[in-house]
């Protein structure tokens, strides 16, 4: 099993698909990485030679931010926006949609489950 960027890649899938298991690599970047590393995209992960795995690993390390580094950069960017106190930072802080979506209805994913109304307990019957 090939291990690249701290991720075990599935053995039976094509390397083009296997690379997408790494956080930060999608279809397009997987194709570019394989093109730069001079590896055929239809090769199964189990059929890769040690030299091909090394070339893929080096290409990713040199050209692409993946896994922990990418997650750290994204979280620092969000934290920076919140520290600035700009509109986007405030939206992040409040847990609301950041990119201009409506919130009167929808936005449930970002806002979380509905908070139900808390009703008052029924008043006791007046004593006669």
From Swiss-Prot:
Keyword Lyase attached: no
Region Disordered, residue ranges: 95-128
Biological processes, Gene Ontology terms: translation
Keyword list, A-Z: Ribonucleoprotein, Ribosomal protein, RNA-binding, rRNA-binding, tRNA-binding
Gene Ontology molecular-function annotations: rRNA binding; structural constituent of ribosome; tRNA binding
Biased composition (Basic residues): 95-118
SUPFAM superfamilies assigned to the protein according to its UniProt record, in alphabetical order: S13-like H2TH domain
Keyword Ribosomal protein belongs to the record: yes
Pfam families in UniProt: Ribosomal_S13
Domain of life per record: Bacteria
Cellular component terms (Gene Ontology): cytosol; small ribosomal subunit
Gene3D superfamilies for this protein: 1.10.8.50, 30s ribosomal protein s13, domain 2 (4.10.910.10)
Subunit annotation: Part of the 30S ribosomal subunit. Forms a loose heterodimer with protein S19. Forms two bridges to the 50S subunit in the 70S ribosome.
Function as written in the Swiss-Prot or TrEMBL entry: Located at the top of the head of the 30S subunit, it contacts several helices of the 16S rRNA. In the 70S ribosome it contacts the 23S rRNA (bridge B1a) and protein L5 of the 50S subunit (bridge B1b), connecting the 2 subunits; these bridges are implicated in subunit movement. Contacts the tRNAs in the A and P-sites.
Family named by the database record: Belongs to the universal ribosomal protein uS13 family.
Name recorded for this polypeptide: Small ribosomal subunit protein uS13
Natural source organism: Anaeromyxobacter dehalogenans (strain 2CP-1 / ATCC BAA-258)
């Amino acid at each position: 099993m090939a291990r690249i960027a701290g991720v075990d890649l599935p053995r039976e899938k094509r390397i083009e698909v296997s690379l997408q298991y790494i956080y930060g690599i999608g279809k397009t970047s997987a194709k570019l990485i394989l093109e730069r590393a001079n590896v055929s995209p239809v090769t199964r992960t189990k059929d890769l030679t040690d030299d091909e795995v090394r070339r893929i690993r080096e290409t990713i390390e040199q050209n692409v931010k993946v896994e922990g580094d990418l997650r750290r950069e994204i979280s620092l960017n969000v934290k920076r926006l919140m520290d600035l106190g700009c509109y986007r930072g405030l939206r992040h802080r409040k847990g609301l949609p950041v990119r201009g979506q409506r919130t009167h209805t929808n936005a449930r994913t970002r806002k979380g489950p509905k908070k139900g109304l808390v009703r008052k307990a029924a008043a006791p019957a007046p004593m006669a």
